[in-house]
Regions:
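Hydrophobic transmembrane alpha-helices and their immediate loop junctions
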Residues: 1-196
């Protein structure tokens, strides 16, 4: 029973982290003039629209996973570089804001069930934000970098984007994943500690 309830709480935490992250991308793109995500029904906080089943299981088992990427057309932005950067960072920003809200809930609400769920939401939002800031396509960290490098290099990188899964697997197996992600997680926690 404990294991089942623990898994359910994890799923809630993951669903919230993924939903706010992808909504952040979709809504920021909408504000900047691109309604591609809205047309595909992705400008929503409904987890069913964003969750990838395999990515969900991967997050529960390996603590690293993925969601269905929100479709964005940067060519609809008035300024490609600025728009692409803002949209790339919007998901991570949404994760951090959500974590802050949950910290404040735990600070002022004393109810075990709510506190437990909020704690998982915090952990997964921090983890999802840090993971997405890695400068590897198709993650948000690369989205920011790609806005400022010549198009021909972008094309070259995206040509080999399918190899990203191999890179992630290698990072996990070798333990290098923690080496790269831990500093990002530490920075995010320093921000969150300001609200504790």
């Amino acid at each position: 029973m404990y294991i089942l309830s623990n898994i359910l709480v994890q799923i809630v935490g993951i669903a919230v982290a993924i939903s706010v992250h992808e909504f952040g991308h979709a809504y920021s793109a909408h504000l900047l003039g691109d309604d591609t995500a809205k047309m595909y029904g992705r400008m929503t906080l409904n987890p069913a629209k964003h969750l990838d089943i395999m990515g969900l299981f991967a997050m529960i088992i390996f603590h690293i996973g993925w969601a269905k990427p929100v479709p964005v057309n940067p060519n609809n932005f008035k300024n490609y570089k600025v728009g692409n950067t803002i949209v790339s960072l919007a998901g991570v920003t949404a994760n951090i804001i959500t974590a802050i809200i949950c910290i404040l809930i735990n600070k002022y609400v004393n109810m075990y069930a709510i506190n437990l769920i909020a704690q998982y939401v915090i952990v997964y939002n921090v983890g999802f934000a840090a993971f997405n800031l890695l400068p590897i396509p198709p993650l948000d960290g690369w989205g920011v970098i790609s806005s400022f490098i010549p198009y021909k290099y972008n094309e070259l990188v995206y040509k080999y984007e399918s190899m990203s899964s191999i890179i992630f697997l290698a990072l996990i197996i070798t333990g290098a994943y923690s080496f790269f992600v831990s500093p990002i997680i530490n920075i995010i926690w320093k921000i969150l500690y300001l609200f504790m």
